[in-house]
Amino acid sequence: NDISDNEKKEIQKRWVFSFDEKNSINLTEEELLWIKNNPIIKIGADANWPPFEYVDSSGNYQGIASEYLNLITKYTGLQFEVNADNWYTTISKTKNKELDMLACVAKTADREEYLDFTLPFLSIDVVVIAKKELQIKNFDEIKNYKVAVQKGNFVYENLIKKYPNIEFIFATSNKEAFELVSYGKADVFIGNMPVFSYFVEKEMLTNLEIKFKADFEKIDLSMAVLKGKETLFNIIQKVMPEIIEDEKEKINKKW
């Protein structure tokens, strides 16, 4: 069903939002029609990965990624139905094509087989976290320790290739991984600075510290769309540079 000129104008008036007329998003007729016919997008999220994304005690989706989704809604009119769960379940649902996209995800070779990644909105350092008394000098030494990892996490995918004999202790969330180390059930956790700061402050895990940066490049966080959904990907990819330029600093300061 084609879109009439009047309908097109109405959709643009209602949905094509811009902070500044100069920066309005030029969506094609095909993209506008796609939005009209697919207004609600099923998006997968990690329920416990603050400050990037999490579900608060009232059941609301919060965090840096949620701010970007709200802005995509303002720019395009797309609405997001958030399916938040532990990360392993979220990744599995995405692979099974139960979800349209992910809100906040690191690119890996495995994920590139079934996802198209947008422009990154954040780069983060990966760090090695352990109890204060643990003497660990360099990244290569982690092969001698029990390493807490979140199932399905990019860190696990990287480590298993480099150190296939590491003893992994699996956690369903970052919070659980920090607790495993804090309570002595695992020796180290490889995570990132913002998540560590958030949990140490909130959960009072004062016996943990960052030992050093992990032997990884910085991790880029992006949104990712299921392969085969080219129009949705093109819309998100078109909007992200505008949002990043206008709002990135404000969002990062807030979180």
Language-model segment annotations:
Residues 1-29, 66-75, 132-156, 160, ...:
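Extended ligand-binding regions for polar small-molecule ligands
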Residues 42-47, 115-138, 151, 223-227:
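Hydrophobic/proline-rich hinge and linker segments of small-molecule sensing/allosteric domains
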Residues 3-6, 59, 94-97, 184, ...:
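Short glycine-centered helix-capping/turn motifs at secondary-structure transition points
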Residues 7-10, 14, 25-113, 163-179, ...:
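Extracytoplasmic small-molecule ligand-binding "clamshell" domains
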Residues 33, 115-123, 127, 169, ...:
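Short beta-strand->loop
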Residues 88-95, 103-114, 158-161, 179-217:
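A ligand-binding cleft/hinge motif common to bilobed small-molecule-binding domains
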Residues 170, 175-180, 197-198, 220-225:
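Membrane-proximal, cysteine-centered motifs at transmembrane boundaries in secretory-pathway
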